[in-house]
Amino acid sequence: MPDYEKVIEASGNGRYSKLNTVLGKGAYKVVYKAIDREEAINDNEITNVKVTRQEFKDLGHEIDILKSVRHPNIITFHDAWYNETEFVFITELMTSGTLREYIRKLTPLPNIKIVKRWCRQILKGLAYLHGHEPPIIHRDIKCDNIFINGAHGEIKIGDMGTAEMKNGKKYTVIGTPEFMAPEMYEEQGYNEKVDIYAFGMCLLEMATGEYPYGECTNAVQVFKKVTQTIKPECLSRVQDPELLTLVNICLTPEDERMTAQEILEHRFLAVEPEVVLVSKDMTMKLLTLQVVFKGMDKLSVKFEFNADTDTAADVVAEMIEEQVLQNCYQQLITCEINRILRDIARNQGPPDKGEDEKIVWRRENDIRSELERAKKDLALAVERVFEAEKKCELLEQHNIIAEERCKETIFALEQAKFQIPDLLQPQPQPQPQPQPQPQPQPQFQLQPQLQYLSPQSTTSPGPTSDDNSTNSTMLSSLESELSKLCVSGDEQVETTTHSALMENVLAGKAKYYEYSNDTSIDKFVMDTAGATNRSKDKQKQWAAKLQDQDIMTVGDLRDLHDEDWSGIGLTVFALRALKNMLAGKKAAVTQRGLQGTRSGASTPVEEQEQELM
């Protein structure tokens, strides 16, 4: 013991002594270094927690359980007692601190091999806890509560103070919000699978070095995202596809979530087996081989192999059929057996010619079967790549066509915007003549794809009493054609110009009243779909996606923040249509101003342009 370390307190039985070295402090506890005088070791820590005597009595059953927990990947709980106003307990000391502190020190982040090793140890500890009857739920799994011995890469689960045995479902809300499963916030209760959800968040932190939901500024935002099953932003920065798949498996709903033991058997955490030669007879024909799974709890598989009558492919297929081996190991173990046979043949010397031919034939047969299998896999991969390229080319063509049509539509609308206000200006009516000549009407020319204003309309004499209705009809035709183009553009092109154009058109076609907060979302979506010329199928799709987000009334829709709109899952066109429909009062004022202009009100040209936009 160094000179600066001194004993400041001893346990009631005299076995443990508390030193003056403080290892950590929390809101309710202080952790000191301690010595075990019976074992003569100082790799223990003593923790003082402020509790009442009654609370300590209530913890008696849990303390007895924690004392009985013994596993290489769980910090050992030695003893506990009540000391006046404090609950004191002795646990094993981990030299390198928490896993979170260790990850922060690493530059760059740990590689996949190290992450796999950590995951296996954490899952083994969880599988042990969940394997009790009834299961023990930790309820606060996070990298801050997982400890490491950096010299050996040893991982252990600690801070078992929140652990509890499960008889049926639990309802107590306890833990860290970023690592708490959605069911912990609900009234239906939860089980040991909340630890699997928290493990998924730990795996995410190991892979990215980022704290889950780091984009949130408070616990309320975290709660909202968790209950809406919105995953952390750092999930998009996971590079390894298999690791990403494993994280998503851990974050699935409770009834779909795998157990700790099942995740241990996932291919991402699987250790490649190795085939070793255990023994051989004098003739080198009868061999005893063994499949060894290093770093896993699986038992080794030992089997006999006759070099004269057996082939590697047949023996491995037989073991898979008898469920001794998993199918995913077939190719690897077959190659390993063939490697051992080649080594024996090379060291044995030149065999008889007949036997040599048999061995060569068997080896060639095995190689041919492996090549055929590889060819099939390659052909399938090439076919998938070809199909993906075709889809990409088709999407590019659709995007080009949609962009061209959108540009033409914008040009046509600009033409209409600058020509129609001149036609809408009130003109003096011509004096009646004895034999009036028919006034030439404005001419409009219909192009193959869009309707444009004919140049003649700008030079025609002053409009008659039917001119306003003709111009209105022309504008309606342009809006109708634009809506048709936007149906395809809604699914393929979402440029800034296109979105702004949709908003301007929708603002002129919206219903002219405000909706009350208790208006049903079905009624609101039906009006929006009707105003934008959308089909009933589109209406149902919009309503379904809103209701999936628990948006049942117009009031729920108004309560959404800007960042919440993007999480609904609708297209940009649909979101803008819904937002315009919410602004019904503004649209009504705009429409009344436009009607006043057409009936002869003296509105300036600039105001008319603003109304049309």
Curated annotation (Swiss-Prot):
Main function: Serine/threonine protein kinase that probably participates as an intermediate in an intracellular system controlling nuclear proliferation.
Family: Belongs to the protein kinase superfamily. Ser/Thr protein kinase family.
Gene3D superfamilies linked: Phosphatidylinositol 3-kinase Catalytic Subunit, Chain A, domain 1 (3.10.20.90), Phosphorylase Kinase, domain 1 (3.30.200.20), Transferase(Phosphotransferase) domain 1 (1.10.510.10)
Biased composition (Polar residues): 592-602
Keywords: ATP-binding, Kinase, Nucleotide-binding, Serine/threonine-protein kinase, Transferase
Active site: D140
Name of the coding gene: pkpA
Enzyme superclass (EC): transferase
PANTHER family associated with the record: SERINE/THREONINE-PROTEIN KINASE WNK WITH NO LYSINE -RELATED (PTHR13902)
Biased composition (Low complexity): 442-475
E.C. numbers: 2.7.11.1
Reactions the enzyme catalyzes: L-seryl-[protein] + ATP = O-phospho-L-seryl-[protein] + ADP + H(+); L-threonyl-[protein] + ATP = O-phospho-L-threonyl-[protein] + ADP + H(+)
Originating species: Phycomyces blakesleeanus (strain ATCC 8743b / DSM 1359 / FGSC 10004 / NBRC 33097 / NRRL 1555)
Annotated region described as Disordered, given as residue ranges: 424-475, 589-613
Record-given protein name: Serine/threonine-protein kinase pkpA
The organism's taxonomic lineage, starting at the top: Eukaryota, Fungi, Fungi incertae sedis, Mucoromycota, Mucoromycotina
GO molecular function per UniProt: ATP binding; protein serine kinase activity; protein serine/threonine kinase activity
PROSITE patterns documented for this protein: PROTEIN_KINASE_DOM, PROTEIN_KINASE_ST
